[in-house]
Amino acid sequence: MSGTQSTITDRFPLKKPIRHGSILNRESPTDKKQKVERSSSHDFDPTDSSSKKTKSSSEESRSEIYGLVQRCVIIQKDDNGFGLTVSGDNPVFVQSVKEDGAAMRAGVQTGDRIIKVNGTLVTHSNHLEVVKLIRSGSYVALTVQGRPPGSPQIPLADSEVEPSVTGHMSPIMTSPHSPGAAGNMERITSPVLVGEENNVVHNQKVEILRKMLQKEQERLQLLQEDYNRTATQRLLKEIQEAKKHIPQLQEQLSKATGSAQDGAVIAPSRPLGDALTLSEAEADPGDGLCRTDWSSGDASRPSSDSADSPKSSLRERSYLEEAPERSEGVQDAEPQSLVGSPSTRGAPHIIGAEDDDFGTEHEQINGQCSCFQSIELLKSRPAHLAVFLHHVVSQFDPATLLCYLYSDLYKQTNSKETRRVFLEFHQFFLDRSAHLKVPVPEEISVDLEKRRPELIPEDLHRLYIQTMQERVHPEVQRHLEDFRQKRSMGLTLAESELTKLDAERDKDRGTLEKERACAEQIVTKIEEVLMTAQAVEEERSSTMQYVILMYMKYLGVKVKEPRNLEHKRGRIGFLPKIKQSMKKDREGEEKGKRRGFPSILGPPRRPSRHDNSAIGRAMEIQKSRHPKHLSTPSSVSPEPQDPAKLRQSGVANEGTDTGYLPASSMSSATSGTALSQEGGRENDTGTKQVGEASAPGDCLDSTPRVPTTVFDFPPPLLDQVQEEECEVERVAEHGTPKPFRKFDSIAFGESQSEDEQFENDLETDPPNWQQLVSREVLLGLKPSEIKRQEVINELFYTERAHVRTLKVLDQVFYQRVSREGILSPSELRKIFSNLEDILQLHVGLNEQMKAVRKRNETSVIDHIGEDLLIWFSGPGEEKLKHAAATFCSNQPFALEMIKSRQKKDSRFHTFVQDAESNPLCRRLQLKDIIPTQMQRLTKYPLLLDNIAKYTEWPPEREKVKKAADHCRQILNYVNQAVREAENKQRLEDYQRRLDTSNLKLSEYPNVDELRNLDLTKRKMIHEGPLVWKVNRDKSIDLYTLLLEDILVLLQKQDDRLVLRCHSKILASTADSKHTFSPVIKLSTVLVRQVATDNKALFVISMSDNGAQIYELVAQTVSEKTVWQDLICRMAASVKEQSTKPIPLPQPPPCEGDNDEEEPAKLKVEHHDLSVAGLQSPDRVLGLESPLISSKPQSHSLNTPGKSAAEHLFVTATQFAKEQHANGALKEGDGGYPVTIPGPHLPVSEERWALDALRNLGLLKQLLVQQLGLTEKSTQEDWQSFSRYGPASEEVQADSGIRDLENVKACHAREGQMSFKTGTGDIATCDSPRTSTESCAAQDSVILASQDSQASNVLVMDHMILTPEMPPAEPEGGLDESGEHFFDAREAHSDDNPSEGDGAVKKEEKDVNLRISGNCLILDGYDAVQESSTDEEVASSFPLQPVTGIPAVDSSHQQQHSPQNVHPEGPVSPFTPEFLVQRHWRAMEDTCFEIQSPSCTDSQSQILEYIHKIEADLEHLKKVEESYALLCQRLAGSALPDKLSDKS
């Protein structure tokens, strides 16, 4: 018997299953060798030596009586097959012959012994092998031995009986006691004549059949009476079964009485001295089976009155059970194993099977194993049920059977799990799209259509389940009947194993574990059948596999979820995890009531009888023995154990359920499987011996497990979550997933394992808060407060679930991979980063939330704002922010490393798969668990916003909102860190793919710099595809990277990113190529919009190698806007960082304290100007001049210590720029707009030459009016003007400076235009604005930095007469009426409104201008020569001559030269040095022409100058148009026709 388990797998391929059948269905009582063993000591006299017979004598007597003949027949298979059935082993007999079938036509008779099949000797073969040979072709040649045609039928037992001990045939069979003898046993001490014995056996059969028919009729009558009183589906089903069975019994009885004249039965005798133990079906009150045991020492028989029970028919049939090999195996085992109460024993009735009805073949199977009679009996026998499942899955649609079993599973599920199991039941069997759809009654389907399944109450659950089970039961019974027929033909699986299990079950209650082990092997066969399903049936097969494994797990079978099912679950969204399906109740008493098979230390999956008193004693013993903490490892085993092999549940020894055992009792458990037989089962005492090996229902492997109490998780994490009591599955040995195995419950323990703590958070949805509080409390709360409490509960619950997820990541992945050394420490750090810190933070946060919950005993939390602020602001915010940023920013690297290592390292790949299959992971992969930290951070602000939404008390609401804002700050910080990390990772990838092999020194001078380009040293701001439009016919697809200081233009080729220089032929120089760099430095970049394409932009690079214009086209307008904005901002940032302060001379101490602030202020102002000088429209127009925003504006004109000249020039410069801007905004109507990117509003380009002409016209009109004054009024005007000398000086300065700046601007423009048209020397690619803006910036800085000692300053209009330097008129602002502004109100009105306004009013009222000759005549001054000499002008002029502004202060010329300000860079026609020289000469030529106000030819001279200015401005306009045309040519676009014609 010990070798039975080890040979199961070897014997699975149907090698030698044994034929079993009921005697009731046989024609003669000569089937199988167990006839010898059927008679117990009640039938034999052990001292009778005459009972021994030899095989030869038996054959001789048989031949003499019957005269057997041997013949050969050839059978041709027809539409109904061969028309015969065979049975028996060694040899095989013809069981039945179908009337008018192929076998009957060939001459085969019932009872013929098959000698050969197609010439192959089969006398020592079993019936399965014979069936295979017969089915090998459409013809079969049989050599049979039997009675001659026309002679009486031969009992099968004659030629089949074979002693089990000696191996010889014995023709004598003992005569069993008659059923009516009531215990008086008749001993057979001598051989009985064959004819007489045959008659005795036949009479017994007839009597038994009559009695069975009578009992069945009585039972049918009782059932009908019960059904009339209470009509139930179950009673109706039993009535139908009884009505079906009665005709079968009547037919058998009629055949038996009609064949009384047939031959006799030879009863074999038993050798002396053999102790015979006959194991019949076991009377088990748990599963309803009636079995008997007889021993050779019994002196009497139990009465047959036990058949009067409601299951009498089953008992009658179980008495006739035959098992030839089982009895043989039992003899080799223990001869005494009595199981069951004597009251359950019945008298054995041995009868002959002389009828030839093959239609009742299933009764033979029932005679062998009554559990196949009904599904109710079968579902408690794991191995038998597994064989039946294999048959149904292979031959039929198993939906109805699985529906029946899952309904039964629902009934056995505890109340906590019923709703979930019903939802699964609905998804599998009732739903429209269910893969195992079964017919649903109309009333149920209508109800399911009306409401959602999760909203159906539990009472309806039970009703639906019961209705569906009754609905599918008839179909299940039909499958069972077909199975019995197939089994009779030997076409079912594991026949010999089931036979041995039945034999061992009678003598050893521990065989239930062997049944489970056998069922486990059969389940693998079922999985193989399901694996072969078509691809379209894959999901259906997975669902069937899930249901089967669920039910087998419920029966205690060790099931292992296959890898393919785990993978399929990802595609089958509805498929739930098996691990949760059977949460058993922990109370032993409740389990005893529900199942009748209580387990003290485990779930009720090991059926056995129970003793309530023993359960109570066990409870007391367990409570007294249970340790508070885990026992030490030293008490378990002296050998060290691999931590990876330890179960997380604690103790595990071949499925041992003693999760917590005293240390002193563990030594006996180390023997593994070498335990006593009694230790492997549950005794009637109800207690398990400490150290015994329980049923291997938990263990998936056959190797013994060394028990241990070492727990894998560190002590700080052992008691995190202990509010609820629940079960989880063990983490498998070596990380192997065991999805279907759960931890055995620890019914009386005070502490929980870490896995049980994890189970607390396995629910995806938080529990309803309203279920946690009393109804009285709920009635006293407002609806808003109830919702607030629910959100708070969700916050607490999800935090606990997140802690559990982090623990899974730590324990299932990090700790294990660290222990097993799969990854190096550096790789561990890259993947798991600072997981310990994150876990510690959230564990602490979870503990604080628990404290808040405990503080509010009613579960209604009043104030939480202060707690939230503590958690998410201050130190808590900083810790969480930085820790989360470190962890989350590492995600891209971690996921990339996991992906790459799984491809390269098979060991790591296997580990990850095993760990991900762990039920604790809830079907999440490692790459899904790592991002949960980021997901948690996004949930905080949402939850806090909802709490604030439902909070009515304003102070509390504000606190919660403030905490929510802090959570957003944390999230933003982490988001930024993640973006930067992702960008860094992408840059590293781009750097690896960067290809610089196409760079050639001949194409680009700085090729070495490009070859050494390192993208990883910079931060990436933006990336994306752009198209570079080189010209009209050529465009290049680019992948552009905007880094913090450069713009990189790459080309994608295969997997490479190519860095390449491109060139094009310029229109001006057709014989040469212009090379463009693929890397653009943002410090020299200007951005402009393309007028003809709203998806394109110009990027103008002012590099040392010349100006380069790139026309880049985005895919959409919005993308272009993003690119333009980001490039402008980054360019401004780079310029701001690279700008160095300009050294300015320190003012003398006498200038006052305010002067000390000037250099620093000007540095900052110049710094701001240089950052975005060409991108801010305000700066372009001069509105944001440093002088406007500087502190000197706040000083009045009469501030002590300040020279009047400094204020004059400050005022003049500001006024000139303001008027310039105003004029541009009011009068500008340029023909080609320019969009200036940046954060400010765009400004259109203006035609400055046109503006100058308009302003000149207005000036001409004004001067004509002023010169119209009579000669005689000149002296009076001078006298009147003398009272306003200081103010007049300012007015003069305003006018003069404006004129000079216009001269400077014109010079700059002319120089640039000249180059573009071929007249200049140095190339530039600036816009018309660029020179003006640059000069304005330099003028502002240098003007403000000058310091003058003079008090009287005369600034004169300077007209340049040379055509190379055309003069410019003042670009002062004009209002709509055409009046010219000469005041400087804006320079002082902001800070000194009183003084500024007063001075302005006086100036407007009293100032009169006079012009005489080449000079401006200032009214009110007595002597003209004070301002007309060269010496005075040179000594009093305080300005540094820069950028076109004439300066005559020779004493300061060297000290404040432009070289001191801008020492580096080449000298161009637009530099201060060049312009100063030319203006200085012009000053020398004109300063001596200043005459007194009395000159009479002044009018004609002014008109002459105006005429020259007009001519020069006309020329400037043409140059400007030519420049615009050239710019458009370079950009690949054409100007309108009118511009081309003008050029």
From Swiss-Prot:
**What's the chief localization of this chain?**
cytoplasm
What are the recorded GO MF terms, alphabetically? Answer: G protein-coupled receptor binding; GTPase activator activity; guanyl-nucleotide exchange factor activity
Among the Pfam families in the record, one is: RhoGEF
Q: Where is the composition biased (Low complexity)?
A: 293-312, 663-676
Task: Describe tissue expression.
Answer: Expressed in brain, predominantly in neuronal cell bodies.
Where are the annotated coiled coils located?
Answer: 194-262, 981-1004
- Modified positions (Phosphoserine) in chain numbering: 41, 309, 341, 637, 1288, 1327, 1377, 1457, 1540
Record-given protein name = Rho guanine nucleotide exchange factor 12
Q: Which organism is it from?
A: Mus musculus (Mouse)
